[in-house]
Amino acid sequence: WVTAAHERGLQLHAWINPYRITIDGEDEWNAIPDSSPAKQHPEWVVKYNDNYYFNPGIPAVQQLVVDGAAEIVKNYDVDGIHLDDYFYPGTDFADEATYERYGQDFSRIGDWRRDNVNTLIAALDETLHTLDKNLSFGVSPAGIWENKSANSKGSNTQGQSSYSELYCDSLQWINAGTVDYICPQLYWSIGFEPADFQTLVKWWQKAVSTSDVALYIGIGAYRSAEAQPGDTWYGTDEIERQLTLLDDSIDIQGEVFFSYASLESIDGCPAFLTTHYAEDKPVTKPDTDNSGTITQEEAQQQATLLDMLSRFIVSLFR
């Protein structure tokens, strides 16, 4: 993957889901080998809604995640580390005993949980940039930091709160400079009243406006792939509207589509995106010594839709 990406002048960012162990319940859990840290240390694991998660409040678990990311950077010539939005899965996470042991400095469990995530982000920032100062480190949090009804700093929305329900304080990461970029998952349409795409774009623009943190916008292409005739997301119209809005916006370095497989399956989308990105500055190879044998002409011939999406598409994991 690294070689193939670099031969085509693309960056490759390793995608990490920091705490989630399973997504398919007991069958997946039973298939995990005994050598896994999850099986070696069952005291690190919390069951939540039939799935299993590492407990973010345990310092050894935080170190496990940091060490895992560092192992990737040490052994592979990746250009970045990208964390998904799954930290705490919900408010009723069974970590009261962990809070009693490690949370003495916090009067509220929510503040302690957010501090655990902040501590992980800061540790990753320091460790990864010590290994490679040019590495990009970022997170794609859920699109709503907090609703204005709960916090005056929040957005005019009525959706799931990353701050209160998933314990991700992405504003803290931006203000502390512990991420190089932020990529909020704005998987709603323009005009969707509970969580309007344009409203959230403006909120995130303001959030990064006084920082050095780059802003990329996550677009829910999977919604178009799953849409039926008559739906707002059906076809390419909604994606086109969102890209037009982003093209006219400041403080936005690009967009990330979830997912690449979805883009390929939407009727007319590959052709539209090829045209849309055709006038962008061509992708240039990273300033590294990638000793592939592919020629410039061969690279051009082998180019796919991904090569045209030069504005930082990292969603290759589906």
List the predicted regions and their residue ranges.
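Aromatic-lined carbohydrate-recognition surfaces of secreted/lumenal glycan-active proteins
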Residues: 11-19, 82-83, 113-162, 214-222
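Substrate-binding cleft of secreted/luminal carbohydrate-active enzymes
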Residues: 167-171, 175-193, 210-287
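Aromatic- and acidic-residue-enriched segments that line the glycan-binding/catalytic groove
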Residues: 20-49, 86-105, 150-159, 231
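Conserved, mostly hydrophobic/aromatic
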Residues: 5, 65, 72, 84, ...
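The substrate-binding groove and active-site-proximal loops of carbohydrate-active enzymes
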Residues: 48-63, 106-117, 158-159, 185-191, ...
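Acidic carboxylate motifs that coordinate Ca2+ or other divalent cations, activating on Asp/Glu
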Residues: 291
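Active-site-adjacent "subsite" loops/lids of carbohydrate-active enzymes
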Residues: 13-71, 75, 164-168
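Substrate-binding cleft/loops of secretory-pathway carbohydrate-active enzymes
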Residues: 136-183, 188-200
